[in-house]
Amino acid sequence: MKHLLVTNDFPPKIGGIQSLLWEWWRRLPPDSFAVLTSPHADAAAFDANEPYRIERTREPVLLPHPWMVQRINAMVKEFGADFVVLDPALPLGLVGPRLSVPYMVVLHGAEVTVPGRLPLARQVLGHVLRGAQHIIAAGGYPAT
């Protein structure tokens, strides 16, 4: 099965989530997935050294809007992806129900604690999680 990872947080951008995603995905067969992510000044050199497909948008941040849904669906069709992995669950997970294939979300600790304090955000996160085929917990805290 092939899939598409859609994220704002991918190397060469530096950070904990970026490192986690890279460590997880670099261990997969390179022809089993592609990445759609945001731009970075050092992306050309990084992307050239990776054995899998990385496509970067022009927009500095991937946000849930109709154009993003179209972009993801087009890449799904072209690549032949069977499902999409969205990271983070909020806000990117909001595009999930509009995708042409099933979606999964990566759930981080902040996405559990912040919506817990904001009633509307809690409802939105609940909607995203209920629609997801699978939820990938990024650690023990969001898993519980």
Regions found by a protein language model. Name each.
Residues 41-46, 143-144:
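Short, charged/polar "capping" segments at the starts of alpha-helices
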Residues 47-75, 85:
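A short, charged, and often flexible helix/loop element on the N-terminal side
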Residues 1-42, 50-55, 130, 134:
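N-terminal subdomain of nucleotide-sugar transferases
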Residues 132-144:
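A short, active-site helix/loop in glycosyltransferases that binds the activated sugar's phosphate group
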Residues 77, 127-128:
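Structural alpha-helical scaffold elements that stabilize or flank donor/cofactor-binding regions
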Residues 86-92:
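Short His-centered aromatic/hydrophobic patch
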Residues 119-126:
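Charged helix-capping and loop-helix junction motifs
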Residues 13, 63, 81, 93, ...:
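A short, histidine- and acid-enriched strand-loop-helix "catalytic/donor-clamping" loop
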